[in-house]
Amino acid sequence: MNFPTVPAIQKSFQEREAHPAFGYFDPTDEYFDSIIRWQEKRNGVTGLTKEAIGYENGVLGCVSSALQAFSAPGEAILVHSPTYIGFTHVLEENGRKIVHSQLKRDERGIWRMDYEDMDRRLKENRIHLAIFCSPHNPCGRVWQREEIEAAMEVYRKNDCIVISDEIWSDLILEG
């Protein structure tokens, strides 16, 4: 299916093309306001401020920055398995030890987190940083609110910082 682009989009491209630099940018108030409004409208998040929003150029760059800020080379990081290969590469490139908590399929074939396994691995490996992916990549599982809350309680009890990758959450549909 082929159709013409809306004139406003063409105009925006032309305006951007006239700008002398195509690289980095300084986030504007409008940039932050749009994120704050979207989070409130889409996810019911209230109280979000400009100061709480960081700019990163992609999920893996953000994960790398968070790893460097909140952990040291050689430290163990918890991830669910199967694991997004991008997380594996970033963890290895940053010299972190990967500890997997295996997702399990229930009797209906639905992937489930094993909270007891998560808790045990966090304790045994003295883990204080985990990567959580919602919806999960690569299995595609959209976690239910109760499951996310249970996982966050396990992390909280273990004083574990969570890097939460929710890049595809806007594609979740009701039902």
Predicted regions and their residues:
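Active-site phosphate-binding strand-loop segment of PLP-dependent enzymes
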Residues: R105-E174
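Conserved PLP-anchoring active-site segment centered on the Schiff-base-forming lysine
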Residues: A69-L91
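Short beta->alpha connector loops at strand-helix junctions that form conserved
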Residues: S81, H100-D106
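N-terminal small-domain helix-loop-helix segment of the aminotransferase-like
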Residues: M1-G58, S65
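A short helix-loop-beta submotif of the ANL/AMP-binding
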Residues: E93-V99
